[in-house]
UniProtKB/Swiss-Prot annotation:
One of its GO terms (molecular function) is ubiquitin-protein transferase activity. GO terms for cellular component: nucleus. The F-box domain is required for the interaction with SKP1A and SKP1B. SUPFAM superfamilies: F-box domain. It is found in: Nucleus. Residues 3-55 form the F-box domain. One of its GO terms (biological process) is regulation of photomorphogenesis. Pfam families: F-box. Transmembrane segments: none annotated. It comes from Arabidopsis thaliana. This is Phytochrome A-associated F-box protein. The lineage of its organism: Eukaryota, Viridiplantae, Streptophyta, Embryophyta, Tracheophyta. Pathway: Protein modification; protein ubiquitination.
Amino acid sequence: MAESVFSCIPEDVVFNIFFKLQDDPRNWARLACVCTKFSSIVRNVCCKTQCYSAIPTVISDLLPLPPSAAASASSSTAADSSLTPPGGWASLYKLAVCCPGLFHAGILLENSDFGLERELGPDQNLDPKPTTTDLALNDEEVSKPVGSGLETTSFWSLYDDLYTDTIPAPPPEDSIDDQEEEIETSEIRPGRDLPVRKRRKICRSLGSHLASGGWNLSREQGNKLLASRFRGDCLYICNWPGCIHVEEKRNYMLFRGVFKDFKRSRVWRTINDGNRSKTSGLKCAFCLCDETWDLHSSFCLRRVFGFHDDGEPVVRAYVCENGHVSGAWTALPLYT
């Protein structure tokens, strides 16, 4: 029904409306869920235009013009329309404005937990209680729980995170005070145990969400991440400190980025030639790639960052075959 109604609207009118809503990326996320026509416009026109506007330097480096196109301005315009970044314009735009979230940054992986589950609690206890709106969305197969890695591959799947970010959720049944850290206030007396500190109940966004801070990418920041032998590779990541997630044990500064010509980079050769195993259960936060590689275990990151006393690396990062990077910084240990 929606297809037949909106197909009658002239495209110039649709474009005019869409670009008046470009200040908040979540507006396009909502519109992409209306019909396939709107989804196609958002993916192929709006995202491309906004990428050229927001990160022009990155685009010019990721998509260099061929010599024939650079010869004349008229042919370069036509050449631009035929060039597409790995993963598509929608994934690049999502990378520019979205934080990968705790799950896609690898912090909640079971095989690299480093004791975090004891501090944060099991993953299933962190999920908010489903609202009526969420249940309706699940029934219509619009999306799966954010961060679960089970998102649908429908035409709006790239926007599930932003769309879910806009759904107003009523306050939970428990009071706000119950969500704060509960500490036993009884007096310490001889012969009695010390007050027990109960686990904090936290409801956090595990998946991708609208990033805080500036929506730009910098090659200088990427150079600070890679080991010295990979300095010839071009990695753009968001400016420091990225999107800050405050946790009970330590703060995580989540970042995202993209490699230029990833399949021709030295990082990819190291991963491919070394037969590095893929990270189980961790998909890309920005495109439809189902597999990622751990740059830390592949020795592609600077060794100077080191580890915390519980074995957790100070910096971790994961890359998909399209060159999209998700990761997290933490504060350096004091003993270093």
